[in-house]
UniProtKB/Swiss-Prot annotation:
Organism expressing this protein natively: Allorhizobium ampelinum (strain ATCC BAA-846 / DSM 112012 / S4) (Agrobacterium vitis (strain S4))
Catalytic activity: D-sedoheptulose 7-phosphate + D-glyceraldehyde 3-phosphate = D-erythrose 4-phosphate + beta-D-fructose 6-phosphate
UniProt protein name: Transaldolase
One of the protein's GO biological processes: pentose-phosphate shunt
GO molecular function, one term: transaldolase activity
Function comment: Transaldolase is important for the balance of metabolites in the pentose-phosphate pathway.
Signal sequence, start to end: none
Keywords: Cytoplasm, Pentose shunt, Schiff base, Transferase
Assembly and binders: Homodimer.
Active site per the UniProt annotation: K132 (schiff-base intermediate with substrate)
Gene from which the chain derives: tal
A GO CC term attached to the entry: cytosol
Location within or outside the cell: Cytoplasm
Pathway per the UniProt entry: Carbohydrate degradation; pentose phosphate pathway; D-glyceraldehyde 3-phosphate and beta-D-fructose 6-phosphate from D-ribose 5-phosphate and D-xylulose 5-phosphate (non-oxidative stage): step 2/3
Length: 318
């Protein structure tokens, strides 16, 4: 009997949400996604011990423990993780712009271009990389500029249709609407339990997918942030799904029929709308879940980036 993972691969591009080299080698995803949390975890393993020491040596040669050098080393380390993944997967690796730049369009542009330049120095062209940006108004504006420069973007921390509409208008390459974090918010807020069909995160991604397909929007929809395999199965047929190694293993071990749920041919009317900055900010403000989870996600990624920079600073001072 074919595993559910193999059945999923037949209708959806499977992406691994990890920096675990062993898991990526074993599970053979098409793409990989990373974020500051994943990078921090990967750098704590023996696999990247040499890369860490090499980056510290480079930093000391650049003058040592200044904020600028510390930040540059953290960037190099994130790219070391991404470059290692790019050697394994045939597709793209997503590398995230610093979370503390989420409300600064120009700084996000500068960092994104620097990331692409560093990958190129390692022989990895921009068509192998996706620049991850938070789906703030400023992040979306940065993505709009980068797309025109031929740098494809992955808009993350996306919790609402308003964010998805703004990303579509910016013609971004790919969005990552979150599932599990939406479920977390509703379970905490209502005290209720949800099935895969009533899961608010699943419902959100289905609505966004439908809106894109019925209106001919080319931006790729990649569901992200899963709490259980049921959420993944409920989105079978989505353009892409980025999944943790643990859930990929669970799907690989599971058998039984996996029916296609999402398809461009199975859509319902949902009129195309446009959002300017005022309308975007108001729509986000009116959505308590999206507002809270976006802010929380940015804070969490910024905290992990700060932890990495702290580790670097300590090593530089040693």
């Amino acid at each position: 009997m074919t595993s559910k993972l193999e059945q999923l691969r037949a209708m959806t591009t499977v992406v691994a949400d990890t920096g675990d080299i062993e898991a990526v080698t074993r599970l053979k995803p098409v793409d990989c996604t990373t974020n500051p949390t994943i990078v921090l975890k990967a750098l704590g393993t023996d696999m990247f011990a040499d890369a860490f020491e090499e980056a510290i040596k480079w930093g000391k040669a650049k003058g040592g423990a200044s904020d600028a050098v510390t930040e540059a080393i953290a960037d190099r380390l994130a790219i070391s993780v991404g470059a290692a993944l790019a050697k394994i997967v045939p597709g793209r690796v997503s590398t995230e712009v610093d979370a503390d730049l989420s409300f600064d369009t120009q700084a996000s542009l500068n960092k994104a271009r620097a990331i692409i330049a560093q990958y190129k120095e390692r022989g990895i062209e921009k068509d192998r990389i996706l620049i991850k940006l938070a789906s703030t108004w400023e992040g979306i504006r940065a993505a709009e500029v980068l797309q025109k420069e031929g740098i494809d973007c992955n808009l993350t921390l996306l919790f609402s249709k308003a964010q998805a509409i703004a990303c579509a208008e910016a013609k971004v390459f790919l969005i990552s609407p979150f599932v599990g974090r939406i479920l977390d918010w509703y379970k905490k807020s209502t005290g209720e339990n949800y099935t895969s069909e009533t899961d608010p995160g699943v419902v959100s991604v289905r609505q966004i997918y439908n809106f894109y397909k019925v209106n001919g929007i080319e931006t790729i929809v990649m569901g992200a942030s899963f709490r259980n395999a049921g959420e993944i199965e409920a989105l079978a047929g989505c353009d892409r799904l980025t999944i943790s190694p643990a859930l990929l293993d669970e799907l690989d071990a599971a058998t039984g029929d996996l029916p296609r749920v999402l398809s461009p041919e199975k859509t319902t009317p949902d009129p195309l709308v446009s959002l300017d900055e005022k309308a975007f900010r108001w729509a986000l403000n009116e959505d308590a879940m999206a507002t809270e989870k976006l802010s929380e996600g940015i804070r969490a990624f910024a905290k992990d980036l700060g932890t990495l920079r702290g580790m670097v600073a300590k090593k530089l001072a040693a």
